[in-house]
Amino acid sequence: MTNNEKVINNKKSTDSSKLFRYQAKFVAGAMNINQIPNFLLPEIAFIGKSNVGKSSLINTICNNKNLAKVSNIPGRTGQINFFNLADKLIIVDLPGYGFANVPISVKEQWEVLISYYLRNSNNLRLVNLLIDSRRGIKENDKKVAELLLKNKRSFQIIFTKFDKVTDCKNLTDEAQNFLTTLHYSCNVMYVSSRSKEGARELKASLAKCIIKPQRSKGR
């Protein structure tokens, strides 16, 4: 039994994960709020610190290593990228936060863009808050979680690069303590883009968003 199976109450991945057998494609990039599209499809977003492995994880669950551009240089996702999966789901890659080596004005522009999207998207069903397993939860991760709760956004915690650590107990304890301070409960998952551990369970959790009701507030 994997760690992820324990976290999600030992439920097996459902056939809904077959959704990710379809080919996802890049459909839009938004560098400012006026460029944010409305596809009238459920959206799932990925957010995390620069170099946390967002693009690699998106490529892993979509079985396409060239879908989202991967770079070892933090801060290379400078816009919101939208990927269409079988006209059933939109995967949203948000700019990384934290130590990106970009001018302050650019960072502020990204913050405005991300905040606007999180506040106004009526199609957003779930946000995946990515945390580097080697680093643990940092102060800026906490601020993002608070922003999500402020905007009444459902989210789950995804520990990335799990192949680089030997034990998840400390991470699990850290996550549960963190969630307790937020008075929030959610899935906590462990995923490796390299070994593919946890990818199947993650796909299943994302596919469920297709039937999840939309928020009343619209974009």
UniProtKB/Swiss-Prot annotation:
GO terms for biological process: division septum assembly. Transmembrane segments: none annotated. Disulfide bonds: none annotated. GTP binds at residues 48-55, 75-79, 93-96, 160-163, 191-193. It comes from the Bacteria. Keywords: Cell cycle, Cell division, GTP-binding, Magnesium, Metal-binding, Nucleotide-binding, Septation. InterPro entries: G_ENGB_dom (IPR030393), GTP-bd (IPR006073), GTP-bd_ribosome_bio_YsxC (IPR019987), P-loop_NTPase (IPR027417). GO terms for molecular function: GTP binding; metal ion binding. Its cofactor is Mg(2+). Residues 40-212 form the EngB-type G domain. Mg(2+) binds at residues 55, 77. It holds the Pfam family MMR_HSR1. Belongs to the TRAFAC class TrmE-Era-EngA-EngB-Septin-like GTPase superfamily. EngB GTPase family. Necessary for normal cell division and for the maintenance of normal septation. PANTHER family: ENGB-TYPE G DOMAIN-CONTAINING PROTEIN, MSS1/TRME-RELATED GTP-BINDING PROTEIN. This is Probable GTP-binding protein EngB. The gene is engB.
